[in-house]
Amino acid sequence: VSMGRAFKVQTEAVRWSHDEAAFDAWREGRTGFPIVDAGMRQLLAEGWMHNRLRMITAMFLSKDLLIDWRWGERHFMRHLIDGDLASNNGGWQWSASTGTDAQPYFRVFNPTTQGKRFDPEGAFIRRFVPELEALDARRIHEPAAHGLFAPEEYPRPMVDHAAARD
């Protein structure tokens, strides 16, 4: 384990995006994907998030936005009250498919499906994304699909997950 270095050396050749505006949207919980936004806002508010959320948000940054996983690794270490080099680095490399026991590069969590599976009623999302608190369980995971918000109220999804996955 080495902070900022991929275990799989061949993955150092990946051309990561260095889109600071997209990184800021992810970091601040303004991606348009409610479960991602709730997790990132929890991190900023409490300095912690459940491991499932760490995987969802890390995979979203590295595989949906194609932003260098090291940016996320550093951000987590700055904010996690339980931040640990080995655990954090291993989690990021697992999510970005650059580590020893990494997910295959084609394994990408669907943030909408993950939200529906692990927060089916949307209680966690409502807690950290108050803009969505009035939505029922059917709509809270995909507010843009229901045409419920103007972008200044809650952002539209910043990427098309299906297209980003390909």
Predicted ranges, named:
Residues 1-166:
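C-terminal catalytic domain of photolyase/cryptochrome flavoproteins
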